[in-house]
Design a protein with these regions (language model features):
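Conserved class I S-adenosyl-L-methionine
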Residues: 1-33, 47-51, 67, 128-154, 200
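A short glycine-rich, Lys/Arg-flanked "PGG" loop and its adjoining helix->strand segment in the class I
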Residues: 111-126
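Short alpha-helix
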Residues: 165-183, 189
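A short acidic, Gly/Pro-enriched loop at the edge of an enzyme's catalytic core
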Residues: 88-97
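A C-terminal cap/extension of S-adenosyl-L-methionine-dependent methyltransferases
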Residues: 188-242
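A short SAM/SAH-binding and catalytic strip from SAM-dependent methyltransferases
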Residues: 97-109
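Class I SAM-dependent methyltransferase SAM/SAH-binding core
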Residues: 45-86
């Protein structure tokens, strides 16, 4: 197993990793009053899948063995060790909610995946896409990493970066909306990690005195356009036309 995957797994347990998921769960706002069928495509360590499996029927699709071997499994969900081939085998209109977080940047068949995600989503269902945001990555490189050269490179016409998962091709929310077409209505856009990833003072992040006010700040700023534009991630929620 590569050390980078293991280090990434450890990172998501840190306060700055947990806050990412705390924001997502708040923004998704999935009610536990009704049991929903949820698909998490590109589930990674299955943190999101496991969270919702406590009250819902969840299928987690993840082809990377290194990642799913380190998955969270406190609750019961179905793990499918596959990718788009499994997606194509799912009957249409199967899921109430489809989740695809930080996946499309790393694939060459973005449009094909989106076609399949739309297909398996029930009419009236919700599609949740989390994506890297170019402006946020520029801030992160220039401020947190003290690497203005990389920040300059990100502002070039070629918005491609190397990562542990291969090339990361950052795309815009407008591109995503265009890919999905008229069948999917954009209902909301949130920012994630506008502030908490800019400080290298990690020691303070283990305290409630930092964590709770920072989470409140991130939550408030996530709906404000000025901060969505510079957040490290954007979270787009679409509704399939009934």
């Amino acid at each position: 197993m590569s050390g980078s995957i293991e280090n990434y797994r450890k990172m998501v347990e840190q306060p700055w990793g947990r806050m990412f998921y705390d924001q997502i769960f708040t923004q998704l706002d999935i009610s536990n009053d009704k049991r929903s069928k949820i698909l998490d495509f590109g589930a990674g360590f299955c943190i999101t899948a496991d969270h919702y499996a406590a009250h819902h029927d969840v299928t987690a699709v993840e082809p990377n063995e290194e990642m799913y071997s380190l998955r969270v499994s406190e609750n019961d969900y179905t793990l499918v060790a596959d990718g788009i081939d499994h997606l194509k085998s799912i009957p249409e209109n199967s899921f109430d909610i489809v989740i695809c977080h930080n996946v499309l940047e790393y694939t060459d068949d973005k449009e094909e995946i989106l076609v399949q995600l739309k297909r398996v989503l029930k009419p009236g269902g919700k599609l949740s896409v989390v994506k890297h945001n170019l402006c946020g990555r520029v801030f992160g490189s220039a401020v947190l990493a003290d690497d203005p050269k990389t920040a300059l490179d990100l502002l070039s016409d070629d918005n491609t970066e190397d990562s542990m998962f291969g090339n990361r091709n950052v795309y815009s929310g407008e591109e995503l909306t265009a890919y999905l077409g008229k069948e999917m209505k954009l209902e909301n856009v949130f920012g994630i990690r506008a502030f908490f990833g800019l400080s290298s003072n990690n020691e303070i992040k283990y305290t409630d005195e930092w964590y709770l006010p920072m989470l409140e700040l991130e939550t408030k700023a996530s709906t404000m356009d000025e901060f969505r534009k510079v957040a490290f991630f954007n979270h787009l929620l679409f509704r399939k036309e009934a």
